[in-house]
Each structure stands twice: as C-alpha cells, then as structure tokens.
Regions:
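Conserved, single-site charged/polar hotspot
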Residues: 1-263
C-alpha cells in the first residue's frame, strides 16, 4: 500500500486473534473510531485530550490497515476488540456527542514521523490500572488537557517531539475529495457543481432540501440547500461547505445513490 488510505469499512474480530468462535463485524471506519473512543475515554474530558486520544486511536488503526498486520498472518479481519492486542470496541454501543463531532472533524488525520511512510502504531494505556512507560496514558493526557496543552503537545509529551499530525485525502467510498478550502457564496467551479449535484440526489430522499441548478456557482439557493442539509444532520447551519459538511454530504450521497440502485 504506497499511500495511506482511509478505508470505508474495516472488519473487527470481537475477541482475541485465535478465538475462532468470535464473530467478525464489518464496520464503517468512522463508526469504529467513534465506538472505540467512546469505550476508551470520557466524553467530559478536555477537548484537546479527546482529540489527542482520537488521533492516537486513528493512527494505531490505520497502521493495522496499512501494514495488513492480521491479514498478512492469515487472519480474515483488520483488527480485534481485545485490548491485549488492539482497542476496546463494543458492538452497538452508544456514541457520545463530543466524540462523534470530534471524529467527524479529524477522521482523515493520523500520526507520523519524518521518513516513515506508515501511520505510527501509537500504543497507550489507561495509566491507572495499567502502566506503560514511554507511551501515552489516558489519565495522564486528561491531566495535560486540564493544564491547557494542545493535542499535539499532549502527544509529543509521550511520543517525542518528532511526532506530527498528518492527513490524507485518499478516502475510500467517497467520490470526490474535499477541495482544501470551504465553499461559500461567491465560490465557483467543479467542487461547487459536485456539491450541487450531490445535494440534488440527496433531496430525492430528503425532500426538505431544495433542489438547485448544478451550474458550479455558489449562490444563495445553494447556501439554502446546504443550510437545510446541515439542519437535518445536526451540523452548524451556516450554509458553508467546510470539511465536515463536505464529507457528510459525500457519505449521504453514496448511501442514497446505492439505495436508489437497489430499489
């Protein structure tokens, strides 16, 4: 795998690797990260602590994907739910709002070091029941967040100053990548046309969203369609297509398109 790619789905083995009775679950990547973070940390912790822990979870997970750690050893899954090997993951558990929003904001990020291609296997422990010298502790990261540390400061405190937050635009299951800057009234081009076309398809399933001309010009009609979409899906209703809104629209577009194909 030459590039880091965010998978659309991963396969979670709900047990230890050699437990042949454990079930495999096919889970959307973002839903998996939200589940793990909700299982591993507290939603009331400082925002910077939540982000630091999510980044560590994502980087660890993407390392498993990138290196094909289990598949290269003959297993038919991506990762396990056993904390002796991987993260805690609980089927069908509830997701906390603060974690849900944080993952949507940074799901394409991971941690890297200079001259190392793959995402870093950022191991961690809770720091109370288990100690792990040289690795991040969850309660320690909470204390640093309380002191005002930023996510990268928290991470570098444990993993060293040569740790960096990286990102990838390679996202499976998404037809077109985020253009790099928010789209708003006055924006023009193919990215605007993409959003207009996708919102028009989504409006077939969510008729409150007004249809708009797919002309590549971001006018008030497009802003209104975006605002309505944001209101329906609990996003900030500002009529601006930033990172979070772009990928939410893209994900819904794929889902609605697939439903249409099978209906």
């Amino acid at each position: 795998m030459p590039e880091v790619v965010i998978p659309e789905y991963i396969i979670v083995h709900d047990g230890t690797p050699n437990n042949t009775r454990a079930r495999n679950y096919t889970v959307r990547y973002r839903d998996y990260i939200k589940n793990v973070a909700s299982s591993e940390i507290y939603a009331t912790w400082p925002q910077s602590t939540i982000y630091a822990n999510i980044l560590a979870i994502q980087s660890f997970t993407l390392n498993r994907v990138y290196t094909e750690w289990y598949r290269s050893r003959g297993y038919d899954f991506t990762i396990t739910s056993s904390t002796a090997y991987d993260h805690k993951w609980i089927p069908e558990r509830n997701i906390f709002d603060t974690i849900d929003e944080a993952v949507d904001n940074i799901f394409n990020n991971y941690l890297s070091r200079p001259n190392v291609k793959q995402p870093i296997l950022t191991q961690y422990c809770d720091g109370r029941q288990v100690s792990c010298p040289g690795l991040m502790t969850q309660w320690g990261s909470k204390a640093l967040g309380d002191q005002g540390y930023t996510p990268i400061q928290i991470l570098r405190n444990y993993y060293g100053n040569n740790m960096y937050i990286n990102s990838t635009e390679q996202i499976s299951g998404i037809p077109s990548s985020y253009p790099g800057a928010a789209l708003r009234i006055g924006s023009r081009g193919n990215s605007v046309r993409t959003i207009q076309e996708q919102l028009n398809v989504i409006s077939n399933a969510y008729p409150l969203i007004p249809k708009t001309a797919a002309d590549g010009i971001f006018g008030e009609d497009t802003a209104e369609a975006v605002r309505t979409f944001q209101e329906i899906f609990d996003l900030t209703p500002d009529g601006i297509v930033g990172f979070n809104t772009w990928y939410k629209i893209s994900a819904l577009y794929v889902g609605v398109s697939q439903i249409a194909e099978y209906s």
